[in-house]
From Swiss-Prot:
Its main location: membrane. Keywords: Electron transport, Membrane, Photosynthesis, Thylakoid, Transmembrane, Transmembrane helix, Transport. This is Cytochrome b6-f complex subunit 7. GO terms for biological process: photosynthesis. GO terms for cellular component: cytochrome b6f complex; plasma membrane-derived thylakoid membrane. Component of the cytochrome b6-f complex, which mediates electron transfer between photosystem II (PSII) and photosystem I (PSI), cyclic electron flow around PSI, and state transitions. GO terms for molecular function: electron transfer activity. Pfam families: PetM. It is found in: Cellular thylakoid membrane.
Length: 34
């Protein structure tokens, strides 16, 4: 088992999760402003 492979998988998953969280937060903020 390669540590680099695990790091790459965690990094890509983390970026996807952060992007989803930011998108959901922006939608919630825009919905509250309207």
């Amino acid at each position: 088992m390669s540590g680099e492979l695990l790091n790459a998988a965690l990094l890509s998953f983390g970026l996807i999760f952060v992007g989803w969280a930011l998108g959901a937060l922006l939608l919630k903020i825009q919905g509250a402003e309207e």
